[in-house]
Amino acid sequence: MAGPGSLCCASRGASALLATALLYAALGDVVRSEQQIPLSVVKLWASAFGGEIKSIAAKYSGSQLLQKKYKEYEKDVAIEEIDGLQLVKKLAKIMEEMFHKKSEAVRRLVEAAEEAHLKHEFDADLQYEYFNAVLINERDKDGNFLELGKEFILAPNDHFNNLPVNISLSDVQVPTNMYNKDPAIVNGVYWSESLNKVFVDNFDRDPSLIWQYFGSAKGFFRQYPGIKWEPDENGVIAFDCRNRKWYIQAATSPKDVVILVDVSGSMKGLRLTIAKQTVSSILDTLGDDDFFNIITYNEELHYVEPCLNGTLVQADRTNKEHFREHLDKLFAKGIGMLDIALNEAFNILSDFNHTGQGSICSQAIMLITDGAVDTYDTIFAKYNWPDRKVRIFTYLIGREAAFADNLKWMACANKGFFTQISTLADVQENVMEYLHVLSRPKVIDQEHDVVWTEAYIDSTLPQAQKLADDQGLVLMTTVAMPVFSKQNETRSKGILLGVVGTDVPVKELLKTIPKYKLGIHGYAFAITNNGYILTHPELRPLYEEGKKRRKPNYSSVDLSEVEWEDRDDVLRNAMVNRKTGKFSMEVKKTVDKGKRVLVMTNDYYYTDIKGTPFSLGVALSRGHGKYFFRGNVTIEEGLHDLEHPDVSLADEWSYCNTDLHPEHRHLSQLEAIKLYLKGKEPLLQCDKELIQEVLFDAVVSAPIEAYWTSLALNKSENSDKGVEVAFLGTRTGLSRINLFVGAEQLTNQDFLKAGDKENIFNADHFPLWYRRAAEQIAGSFVYSIPFSTGTVNKSNVVTASTSIQLLDERKSPVVAAVGIQMKLEFFQRKFWTASRQCASLDGKCSISCDDETVNCYLIDNNGFILVSEDYTQTGDFFGEVEGAVMNKLLTMGSFKRITLYDYQAMCRANKESSDSAHGLLDPYKAFLSAAKWIMTELVLFLVEFNLCSWWHSDMTAKAQKLKQTLEPCDTEYPAFVSERTIKETTGNIACEDCSKSFVIQQIPSSNLFMVVVDSSCLCESVAPITMAPIEIRYNESLKCERLKAQKIRRRPESCHGFHPEENARECGGASSLQAQAALLLLPLVSSLFSR
């Protein structure tokens, strides 16, 4: 029997053995986690897969055949370096001529309108049945046409996107809050009827014209061609032509404005609500050439934005919205000291004028108050008399008229205007009065300035909603001119009759640009006198949240926000100043929804477009982008090869102008070219140089059709139907497509279709597969898959493409790109087959992708996963899956991080929102809100109630709640690019309790890398690397500096601030426009009955 000592020894021995075993186990773990993945084996896998997949891609794309065919013509082509300056000057001249045609059409409308008005005598009893755009073709319950709604023939027209229109007549829209048969409107409609024949004549002269119109100062809107207008779901048409930018810009000159708002105690409640709405309506009338500030006053002065104390700010969309947010914070208390406010306003206007930064034209003070106890003539005598350069516009808020005389005197003594605003319904009409006063000098001068708006999307018009393209609503600019009264007896009054205009879609500009001469990455762009983008391929005016919506600041995106690498604004400022020249810089251009980046050097060439406020620029990328070549084949040869059914041309490129004659509008570009070459349509105008190159490409690429057909017929060549599509595109926009499977069997049904904008030739870019192939080494293929493919079954494809160069040098133009699309499953199967190979004679591999200790990936040159054992990771960024390895690759220089900026981003923000609808937007809620208000404000109701104030009331408590909204913001985000010179890398990562090894090996002749990672060491202490954008948040002082900062801009060339003959006695009265009760009740009643 063993004693205690023996037991103790035995216990110690067991413990020692256990400790030894644990030590060996731990050492085993360390050894296993530090085991080196054999580079030679990974290199073998990469070589096997690379050879196999390139063989498939080259074979099915026909790349070698096409390269050979172009080489055969090498001696017969002439290579030219593109002269960027000459190109941009030529383009500017073409655009100048196009713009001039549009402005001449508008000028003819001006002459006709003024002549018609001169001959017309106002008749207060005039009875005239006109075509009301809302009522046309409407019948009553007995089947009779409604009054003003007689029969108006409408027919679909392909030039207007098959909208039903009447190209013989215009019709008239009257705002909902105005009386259709008001004598002023009936007389205006009557004499403006003579514009019909000019509308038709303009359209005959220039069939590319779209909407032509006359916006009357009385509020009605005459539009050609005539179209049916449909009210919104509340029975309302909110459109009023007088608050559109084109109207305001044409009617007035640039202005500096200080808005003074009385926030004394007497302004509480309804009055303050009306005052806020009045300020908001004034802001609506200010444009990018105007400057403003808002000051509130009681015993003290309060700048609505304290940061902008003592200065004015440009009235762009961002700044106006910033001030609107501050308006909601206003409250009334104390006593109003107007003298202090007036002194401050005059000093600001004087000081700002001396800086030379403002409009240097008209100046005005807008006073919004419920009364003034004095006329403050000593202040006006000190600052404004005798010249009266600052106009005073006074808005009396409320029904009380005790102090109306003082306010009216101020306005009349300072060439301004006085109005009284009793209800919210009065605001819009009364605010518009000041525009007509400011237009007087221009009218007396009889200066018909041509104005062009910035790019905008006018979704308030029903036809704009329907004239949408695949990308959303159409971006356009408007050319407009004012129409004046020429009657002698009204000359000194300077009566503005209205504004005429026509819209010019931005895509019309793009049609004039020869994309084939700009190279694969080249593009043209244009900006306004304020530096805002008119057209640029990087402009993104829409965002998606359920449906496509306009970004709030889309029309004021500055050139510096898309060409952000130009930190000193050298390019922008030169273009704003209408200079002609050249500028170069390295740029980082994103492709594929912004997730990939191409780093290149661009040469920019720029000049002005005469007769407009626009400047034009052209960007050419260095290297192959600066060269162009001319081939030569006979028309007979080329025409024969264009007849093949697999040939298509870029629909958005302008080979022939099919807009000039109505009979050509139905033609595709390919059909137009064929008719042109056959001489069957002598009226067709075509780009001879481009067509010659199209014929050359058609001839050279023709043999590939027979090649693809032979592959398709030999079913054994593609027995598992892995390869589905072969395609090619040339520098002239010519495409050929071949299907190796039936159309219904295609995995990606959208590929190369019209809706697949990224992968087809567009007005402003080459297909994505073409652009990426051009940046690859000649002879290699670029492979890609849609992002997050693992979650989207229909897109489980791999696209492979390669470029075709004419010469074996960097200066060679990239003449074409060819490629294939194959099933992702087929592609991945080839990868896994290759990764099972090994060089061991006994066939026993030291390592395999099937091993649990390793993870194998196939990633591209931007770090996106094409193959992973976890299928759901397909299309994800490698750094999100293997953060530690990606971090090491960045440290070692195998990949580099490139920081990018997005100044057009939309970020989520929490905002207070009201449950109360405003005005006519929701009659039912307006009714309930009004009822509550009537009960709680009975006394005020008895004194001030009328139908307008009842209709528009949301006077009292608004239920506030936090709501997530998308708002414009600036973001920063990374993109990643592999270092081409590094072909292979091995590495070890020291983690907390283990070491993680990996091997990365480039796949030959591709943009791909095989990455094999030791999976036994998780290395969870290293965070994933994400590509998610981060909002750039600015502190208060920086926000203030950004608000104050004003980029260089060019003022409009004309200014009509004053005229000595102006009759200042027309300065307003105390009456306010009352809307008709029945008219206002109609939408409410119909809304209530429909519920």
Curated annotation (Swiss-Prot):
Cytoplasmic topological intervals: 1090-1091
Signal peptide: 1-33
Tissue-specific expression: Brain-specific. Predominantly expressed in the caudate putamen, entorhinal complex, hippocampus and cortex.
Membrane topology: Single-pass type I membrane protein
SUPFAM superfamilies: vWA-like (SSF53300)
Other remarks in the entry: In contrast to CACNA2D1 and CACNA2D2, it does not bind gabapentin, an antiepileptic drug.
Summary of subunit composition and partner proteins: Dimer formed of alpha-2-2 and delta-2 chains; disulfide-linked. Voltage-dependent calcium channels are multisubunit complexes, consisting of alpha-1 (CACNA1), alpha-2 (CACNA2D), beta (CACNB) and delta (CACNA2D) subunits in a 1:1:1:1 ratio.
Name by which UniProt lists this protein: Voltage-dependent calcium channel subunit alpha-2/delta-3
